[in-house]
């Protein structure tokens, strides 16, 4: 590195845990509300109370009837029942909203509305259902009552001077309802901090523009802004800034005149070109430079000379969201006078993981509820994953003092929401599947993960998931899926195999076939780079089976054949991933579905048809959503949809049980 680069390069200072970072900001007096203001009740939703609220009245403010019926003296109906009814004289009616002038004496009554003031002399209310009005002036009562029955007494709900809401309470529709009932029209609340989000990076483009090679669309700016809006913060997205220290410095300087908190995304790693640290240092004082978490280590927090918070999030989406969820939200809530508790669930780990002691790991998980147990299923993604934001139900938190988590252990999960999805579908990838789930009207009610057929099979064998899509070729029989279930006694006792549909696999290559590919054997050519599917996928099994046949026919070992294939270890996890690699010139040839090849305008040679079936947990068969899924597969209209997609076929037995 040259001298300038060495000067610019920053190493991380002492790394802090999430808790230590929050405590440091608190000890410096930075996590205090920024001010108070009074607002009209109709504008108070989502705000945080800056003072205790004491009731200015009794509630209810008067003794009132809880039912429609008759106001009586207890003595008048003593001993009354179906066999010994009492006849009372009706002396009028008390309507809601009016002050009664009637006084109830023994053997007299008055009809009364729900919510009306209790007239003098009445001890209770007989419900209308236990009476019979025989004349306009007489009523027969078939039930006795106890003192105070069906009466709500003044102050019985809330008493005059009672503490109703505490300072620091976030106002929801419930609090607004109570305040309105007490006649309170204005409340004193903490001011909401004004927050702005800025994305930094030369590689970023605005969604809606044509994506250039090597560029990515800005995810964090939109995702973090929306996430904070969902949490009720006053936040604005400012846009994308280039990796220029001067541009970022000047822009943030301007933003600090209008906002209380500036959040940046990107430009936070300890590399020579990352500039967030240097900009924050010029604007004020660095307080936190690096967290003991993975992902999320390159987080920067500073205080500007104006006393405003600068918060630098990492550039990778899952990393940024994890830190935003577990630390940034806490900071912003403290600035508006609120202290929340993170929604933590406990779930059984379905995976084993070794980690280094000294850092807390954040891992995206899908949550599966089967047989009264909650399972956490790891999504195998990187911190740069965008799909993890969509697929995950929460973040598994593996604390820094742990170096190993075993399958079956209980672990902490920071939940993204209150509700669990009704079913979990994990297994082989297929584009048509999500379209069918949408057509069945259940796409929003299921969690989906594409991990390959073998991993789906393993999760099903352990009883962790509801449905596993598979397409596994048995090399011995040439049959798909059924042999794997029949040979596995444990699996066959836990799941049934339901027929799905057929897909055409093709050998795909660039339009015009510039490499003059004629067949599968051409992937052995030294001038051709192959893109493979991930280990554990059904397509990988097919590829390796074909390569084994080639090895046998040429009297070579499988390992030797593999060593000679350029790109054999270049693995992607989806059919569209294969097609994209070819379309973008990162590979010359690969095996994918015909549909994926067409999406990327590739040429191809047909290889084989495979069955894409559904393994279903026997304990899930009674779930309404699983019944709806199977019914959808059996629907003749669904077969028409499947047959309408190039490279797909719907067999006559689609949706029927195959075994076991």
Task: List each model region and its residues.
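Helix-rich terminal scaffold detector
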Residues: 2-19, 185-313, 317-323, 435, ...
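Short, glycine/charged-enriched hinge/interface segments at domain edges or termini
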Residues: 2-7, 11-18, 52-53, 71-238, ...
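Flexible glycine/proline-rich
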Residues: 15, 19-22, 37-42, 46, ...
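Short loop->beta-strand "edge-of-pocket" segments that line small-molecule binding or catalytic clefts
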Residues: 422-429, 521-546
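N-terminal segment of the mature folded domain
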Residues: 441-522
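A ligand-binding cleft/hinge motif common to bilobed small-molecule-binding domains
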Residues: 469-487, 579-608
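Periplasmic-binding protein-like
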Residues: 491-504, 598, 602-631
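Extended ligand-binding regions for polar small-molecule ligands
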Residues: 504, 508-516, 521, 525, ...
